[in-house]
Amino acid sequence: MDLDPAHKPSQAEETKEQGNEQGQVEQNQAQQDPTTGPQAETEKAIIPSQGSTIPQKRSAEDEPAQPMSKNALKRLRKQQQWEAGKEDRKLKRKDSRIARKVRKREERDALIAQGINPYANKQKPPSVNVPISLIFDCEFEQYMREKEIISLGSQITRSYSENKNAKYRTNIYVSNWNGKLAERFHQILDDKHQNWKGIDFVEGDFIECAEKAREKMKHENMIEPLQRSLTEKSPWARDEKDPLPLPDPEPEPRPEYSDIVYLSSDSPYTLERLEPNTSYVIGGLVDKNREKGLCYKRARERGIRTARLPIGQYMVMQSRTVLTTNHVVEIMLKWLEYENWGEAFMSVIPKRKGGKLKEQQGASGETQETEEAEAEDPEEENEETKDPDAEASASKQNTPKVEVTSK
C-alpha cells in the first residue's frame, strides 16, 4: 500500500517515538559511566565487604620483616660501608698511579738531563725454569664467602704475574678448577687466563696436578740452590712442639707421594730448604683463619707430607703470621734467588705487618737488629680481576721513545 506523504503522525505515535529515543540515550550513558550500570554492579559484587572473612592476598611490602641476627646485621653494615667507600678507594688508586707516573717521569728526565739513556740495560735476562712446582688447592669454596673467593682470584693472578717475572720460574697448577672461581675467570677475564704461560688449570685435585708436574720437572734446569739441597742437611726439621696437637697419632706419609709437600702453618715441620723435583701445595683458602687446621688435616688424611715456612725462626711479627697466597709464592721465588729465608721474608712481607728480622748478637756482644727492608704494600683488592698479560702489554705500548745523545 502506498503511503501518503501528506500524512502526519498522531500525538500518541510522537510520544511513543520520543520515549524510545530517551531510553536509548540513557542506555548509552549507562554503558559509558563506570560507576553505574551492570558492570559497576558486577564489580561491587566482586569487592568483599569490610566484614568479609575471605582471605586477602598480601603484597611483599605488607609482610613483616624477619629480624636479622647480630652477625648478619654486622655483615650487612660492613658490606654497606664497603660499597660506600668504593669511589674513595678508586680515587686513591688513581692518585697513587698518577703520583707513580710523575715520579718515574721525573727520574727519567733527570737521567736524560745527564745524557744517560733511561731505557738502557733495563731488559731483564730471560727467566730460568726450575724443577719446582706450586699447586693451588682450590677445593675450599664452600668455606668462603663471595668476597673471599674474589680475593683468592686476585691472589692467583698476582702469583702468576710474580712467577712470570721472577728470575727463577716455577711450574704453577690450579686444582679443582670447576666452581665459582672458574666461572668468575670465565666472566671477568673472558677466558684470557687460558693464554697464560707456565700455569695449568686442572679440574682434578692437587694429587692429579702433582702427577702432571712430576713428568714436566724431569726436563727443568737444576740451579745451584736446588743442587745443594741434594747434598746438604735435611730440607725440613721436626719442631719440638706441635702448633696444632691432634688426638690421633701422626700417620706415615705414603711413599708414592714423597715428592708432594702441603704447606700449612699448623704443620709441626719447618722448611729448611726447597727440594728439587717437588710439588708444594698451597691451600686456596681465604677465610680470616675461621677454619683452623683445615689444610693440615686434609693433607694428613691423604698421607701427604706437611711443612711450614720458617717465619718464626727469622722474623718477629707485630701482627698475625698468616700470609696471603701470593705472598707465599713470592717468598719461595725469592728464596730460589737469594737462598736465604731472611732476605726473602724482608723483601716480600708488607711493611704494615711490622715484620723485623730476629735480633742477632754483634761482634761486641751488644744486641744488633737488622733494619727492615722496605716492601711496598700491595695495592688494595680491586673489585675486578685484571689480566696481567694485558696490563704488561699496555705498559709497553705506552712507553715513550727518547733519543739521548751520548757524551
Swiss-Prot record:
PROSITE patterns: SAM_MT_TRM10 (PS51675). Residues 394-407 have a biased composition (Polar residues). Its main location: cytoplasm. GO terms for molecular function: tRNA (guanosine(9)-N1)-methyltransferase activity; tRNA binding. Monomer. S-adenosyl-L-methionine binds at L263, S264, G283, D287, K288, N289, R290, E291, C295, L309, T321, V322, L323. It is found in: Cytoplasm; Nucleus. It comes from Gibberella zeae (strain ATCC MYA-4620 / CBS 123657 / FGSC 9075 / NRRL 31084 / PH-1). Residues 91-103 have a biased composition (Basic residues). Residues 1-105, 220-256, 353-407 are annotated as: Disordered. The active site is at D287. This is tRNA (guanine(9)-N1)-methyltransferase. Disulfide bonds: none annotated. GO terms for biological process: tRNA N1-guanine methylation.
